[in-house]
């Protein structure tokens, strides 16, 4: 569904000019006193809106799908921790919005020799790992990143618990 105002209500955000299909609040753990930031996907682009400002700012464009799955995380940038919003869909792959300057970066995931150009339809976060499912060509696979490293998904043979990887869980009855 698309976001729209209900009868008798007022807008929480300024009009974007295109139907918003994904809306996420940017969680600011490292900068809790900053104004709330919202991230929207509409018309093949990613926008941000900072509460109290005049309108949406286009941060990147050229996407095939406006429906994104997302999780919040942290990254180290210049020795400091920065909040990030990680988004993914099965058409465009993974991107990240960085809280330091709200830039958007495309991410190419390395998942090992057996997997190339994997793009997740859904993301989750558990035990300091990012989990991805719904990758085209891998309907029975669940992938996971290295702990504390959301963009590295390869294994570590010497210490498997520190690596990323995939779990294949085939099903024959649709469960």
Tell where the protein language model's regions lie, with residue ranges.
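Recognizes the extracellular SEMA beta-propeller fold with strongest preference
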Residues: 1-175
């Amino acid at each position: 569904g698309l976001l729209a105002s209900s009868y008798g209500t007022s807008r929480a955000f300024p009009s974007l000019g295109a139907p918003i299909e994904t809306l996420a609040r940017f969680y600011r753990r490292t900068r809790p006193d900053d104004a709330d930031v919202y991230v929207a996907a509409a018309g093949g682009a990613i926008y941000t809106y900072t509460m109290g400002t005049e309108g949406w700012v286009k941060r990147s464009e050229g996407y095939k799908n406006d429906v994104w799955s997302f999780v919040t995380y942290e990254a180290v940038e210049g020795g400091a921790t920065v909040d990030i919003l990680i988004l993914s869909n099965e058409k465009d792959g993974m991107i990240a919005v960085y809280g330091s300057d709200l830039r958007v970066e495309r991410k190419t995931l390395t998942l090992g020799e057996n997997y190339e150009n994997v793009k997740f339809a859904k993301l989750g976060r558990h035990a300091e790992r990012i989990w991805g499912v719904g990758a085209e060509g891998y309907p029975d696979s669940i992938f996971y990143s290295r702990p504390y490293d959301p963009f590295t998904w390869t294994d570590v043979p010497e210490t498997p618990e520190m690596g990323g990887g995939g779990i294949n869980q085939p099903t024959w009855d649709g469960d």
